[in-house]
């Protein structure tokens, strides 16, 4: 019998080490079993990386993190080259260990009390007009990190009064009342929480999370602030059917959500959940039409769409694929 991994505080556990801690075991994907990417999934990198390196340098200088880097987002080059980034607060170590996600798992260190000020100054220096703030899950904190979100929102607005702020929050599992008391007192301009996938495979895809809990979080925030758009994102290609995705979309509408993102899941490493299928651009267009017919005011659906991909354009209703 193998000994359990003893996690050291502040150490990042990735790939095989991270997956070893998941109750629902994932079989490592052999190279020959990997699905070949279709032509529409090929990414063209920008010829000039000056802007990309500049944003990375600004992050490093202030000890900040972007989910773009930590989660190995395929759109990193495009977004950084356009001067946009999704900031990840509360460190780069997540207390959850979802097998689709490339963010490191482990025992995180205490939150940086100076992070809100450093974040606000960096955003002001970059002259951003729209910013997305997300975080790792922090099940070790009594409020799940909600107060830190609020402190960041306050600090950003002090430095950049006209900025629009979107928060992409974790589920605050077991801490919803406390978290919502804080977040509804200092609300963002868009409140985002991702369902990620369909209930049938939730235990496999999001161990430690609960589908109905996430729906309730979105609903309760909307009840407190009906004037603020709520948003959620889904990945496809993990073994769900299009019909199941459409039913999740109906659930989101029943819980007051008006903004939707839908994108292709990509396997970060062979230790993560494998891609079961690549969804064609035509299928994404069909699901977008379904979403708009249901009453979503915004629906960004396409192979490379991610929750915060061109979030400023999404919020304006400009088509994003």
Swiss-Prot record:
Binds 2 [4Fe-4S] clusters per subunit. One cluster is coordinated with 3 cysteines and an exchangeable S-adenosyl-L-methionine. SMART domains: Elp3. One of its GO terms (molecular function) is 4 iron, 4 sulfur cluster binding. [4Fe-4S] cluster 1 binds at residues 68, 73, 79, 308. Its cofactor is [4Fe-4S] cluster. Its EC number is 2.8.1.8. Pathway: Protein modification; protein lipoylation via endogenous pathway; protein N(6)-(lipoyl)lysine from octanoyl-[acyl-carrier-protein]: step 2/2. Belongs to the radical SAM superfamily. Lipoyl synthase family. This is Lipoyl synthase. It comes from Escherichia fergusonii (strain ATCC 35469 / DSM 13698 / CCUG 18766 / IAM 14443 / JCM 21226 / LMG 7866 / NBRC 102419 / NCTC 12128 / CDC 0568-73).
